[in-house]
Amino acid sequence: MASTVSAYKEKMKELSLLSLICSCFHTQPHPNTIYQYGDMEVKQLDKRASGQSFEVILKSPSDLSPESPILSSPPKKKDLSLEELQRRLEAAEERRKTQEAQVLKQLAEKREHEREVLHKALEENNNFSRLAEEKLNYKMELSREIREAHLAALRERLREKELHAAEVRRNKEQREEISG
């Protein structure tokens, strides 16, 4: 106590009264303040206008003293009655069945969706094949008609040439008979 009083007396000599009052109300923390929380230490490193930086140091399990409470141990459970255990088991079984039913429902919906997609793809493929076949048949029919028309035109020209040749021969024979 005496050392504290003498320290204050020395401080009084060095500082003005206003500075002393301000220092009592606004104490500055130690620059490397260390805070301890259970099995970790938080050390303040830097304080800037943009923010603060800290260093978090975790103690290893061997460093934990026996006086500190073990945080990872589960809380003590009270003894449960047989009825309570049975009720919990039934509730867990019900949850398991509900979850299993939900999974089965989702799988059934997924399979149904896959079937619908496959059916739609097959239908579109069949429609495409049918349209392509119809288009090909139309083109083949059109080509056949054009070919037949062309052949008919060639036959007609050939018949006309033969008729003309026959007429020319007749005229020549008639001229020979007349002249000769």
From Swiss-Prot:
Coiled-coil residues: 75-179
Bias-annotated ranges (Low complexity): 60-74
GO biological process terms on file: microtubule depolymerization; neuron projection development; regulation of microtubule polymerization or depolymerization
GO molecular function, one term: tubulin binding
Cellular component GO terms held in the UniProt record: cytoplasm; neuron projection
Record-linked SUPFAM superfamilies: Stathmin
InterPro entries, sorted: Stathmin_CS (IPR030514), Stathmin_fam (IPR000956), Stathmin_sf (IPR036002)
Keyword set, alphabetical order: Coiled coil
Pfam families: Stathmin (PF00836)
N-terminal signal peptide: none
Domain (SLD): residue spans on this chain: 38-180
Residue span of region Disordered: 60-82
Family, similarity comment: Belongs to the stathmin family.
The protein's name: Stathmin-3
Taxonomic lineage: Eukaryota, Metazoa, Chordata, Craniata, Vertebrata
